[in-house]
C-alpha cells in the first residue's frame, strides 16, 4: 500500500493540482496519472480487503484495511476519497441490501468496476430541513417489484 501510494498517488495528486479536470460537454477528463493511480489501487484489492473471499476480499480485519487505506488518503485524498465513498456504499449494501443488490452492485464496487458516491446538495437549505426541495417519487406502478429494490425518480437539487 505504501509503495502504491508513494509511486502512483503522490505524482497523480500533484498532476491534478497542475492539470485540473475539465468537461468537454459530455465527459469529465482527468490527468492520465489519476487513472493509473486508481487502477493500481483497485488491482491491489484494498477496496475489498475486509470482505469475505467470496466477495473478492482478503478477509482482513477492518482495522487493518482502514490502516492500509490511510496511505492512499494521505498521498492523495482526491483520488483516495473515491475509494472511501465506494467502500462505504458497498458496505451499506452488504449490511442492508438483498442478495441481488449485493451481487449486482456491491461486488462490482469492491472490484473497482463501479464507484459509489455521496451526493449532498441543497444549497438553499443549509441546516433547515423544511427548506429541502429534493423529492423522491415512486417510478411507475410496479416500482416496488424490481428485483434490485424499489425505484424512485429524484427531482430538485441532487
Describe every region a protein language model picked out.
Residues 41-42, 88-89, 146-147:
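Short hydrophobic "helix-edge" motifs at membrane interfaces and signal-peptide entry regions
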Residues 25-33, 95, 111-117:
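Short, mixed-charge aromatic SLiMs
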Residues 1-81, 100, 104:
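Amphipathic, small/basic residue-rich leader segments at the start of a protein or domain
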Residues 50-53, 81-84, 119-122, 158:
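Glycine-rich, histidine-containing beta strand-loop boundary motifs that form or position
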Residues 81-99:
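N-terminal glycine-rich flavin-associated loop
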Residues 58, 100-158:
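Glycine-rich, Trp-frequent "lid" loop and neighboring beta-strands that shape
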